Amino acid sequence: MSSASSERFRRRLRLLPLALLALFLAWFVPWVLTLYLGVLVYFPYKPDGKSRYVRVTGPVAALFGADWTPRSEIPKACVAAVVAGEDARFFEHRGVDWESVRLSYRVNEKAGRPKRGGSTITQQLVKNTFLSRKRSYVRKARELVGALLLDLTMSKESQLTWYLNVVEFGPNVYGIERAAQYYFKKGAAKLTPSECVQLAVILPRPNRWNRSLVTRRYAPFFQRRYRTICNRIRILGLLEDADMRLARTQAPFPVGEAPLLSAPQLRESETLPPHEEGR
């Protein structure tokens, strides 16, 4: 190689980090702007006096017909059940639960299939609100970065309010208000502790697991997961004893007093049945 060619090669090599940085910024900056725009407008706009949720981005901009329920009208039992069922360390992590990610990898690697999901409520919120449904490493990277940024920007209570207003509880059933009307023929504010736990049970796979709520024939896994969520609520101290008793006594099937689990056992219990795919 001539000295001139060698010099050109070294010059290009020196420019490579700058080119990679430019590519990263071209991907990162628009995504961050989109995220923060979404945070600014997440308080729902009201075209007709009723609050609606607008999907900010994605393959198709869509107006979901989910009535917005303010935090003051969401029963504490619903918040407790969702946190216990979806993200037990929600109030401890900063958007991404790295311990849960590590454990999910270990459990799934050992099982040879997706058995345990690792996404936090914040990650699910970013994924469901700002990202397309297409799975890719780029989408996962944006989900992780978005969750970290969202947690820096928004309080935990606001995240929960947003999540409960946009999460899917069944086919075209978005938000806690629609779920309450669809499954229990009442408004979200009137949900009992038992009904809140039942809704939390189906969240990982609402389009499949909602059959138990629709038919009122509760599958064995539905009953086991109900007991697990009640157990986690008790361990985490998310509800008063009186509401915990109601969650057990009002259940549509027998719910005994489950033994207390240690922290490692609690994390290990966050698995899906064999035929389901981790989040």
Region annotations inferred by a language model:
Residues 2-279:
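Juxtamembrane regions of bacterial inner-membrane/periplasmic proteins
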